[in-house]
Amino acid sequence: MIKILVSNDDGVTAPGIVALTNALASSYDVMTVGPDRNCSGASNSLTLTNPLRINTLSNGYVSVSGTPTDCVHLAIRELYTDEPDMVVSGINAGANMGDDTLYSGTVAAAMEGRFLGLPAIAVSLVGSKLKHYDSAAFFTSKIIKGLLESPVAQDQILNINVPDLPVEQIKGIKVTRLGARHKAAGMLKTQDPAGRDIFWLGPPGEEQDASEGTDFHAVTNGYVSVTPLTVDLTAFNQITSMKEWIDKL
């Protein structure tokens, strides 16, 4: 049976990872390994100065005292006797579109799977009330089936964003590029009970590039967005001009 590793960044007991695991368990051999707390915004961070501890929960899920990347790395390197066939990260509670992908622990967990040579998917549910995890699970299952039948290039992951709608109201699937946000709002400053300044990150910026063809545009218009993301961040179209710039120094 096909083996799928499921992870996330919202924590191993979050509703999204439960919905995803339940949807896949009837067709695949699923191992669910996630962080023991919410690690949203953890990106590709690793735990380097503390040991990782694991705990198997009553439902069989494995809780890890680390980041999403730690979870995937530990599962593949230690918990599996034979490697899984695929890594699926999610279902995230909220969008991972545009610039979000740089900060996302959900995307990072999928990236770690790809770093270790496995096909990988990150999936997020986009909306304010987040009622329809079943819709995200439905489309994820459909895309997994397609990937197993016809794999994509090995240097990429698929970043999926699903509008928070019933399945029958979703118009279809669109392949997209990343959009972009305006810069985030300023820090929120307040004081603790002792009168010392404390700070909270402000809300993310509003959509800046949500034009047709972007993930923002697709989801806003009722479509599932599938964006292929590459691991290599090199700006290849700038290599020649950068050489010319360096030569002038």
Swiss-Prot record:
Entries under Pfam families matching the protein = SurE
Q: Which superkingdom is the protein from?
A: Bacteria
Keyword Nucleotide-binding appears in the UniProt entry: yes
Cofactors (names): a divalent metal cation
Cofactor note as given: Binds 1 divalent metal cation per subunit.
Its main subcellular localisation, reduced to a broad class, is cytoplasm
This one is known as: 5'-nucleotidase SurE
Q: Name the species this protein comes from.
A: Shewanella woodyi (strain ATCC 51908 / MS32)
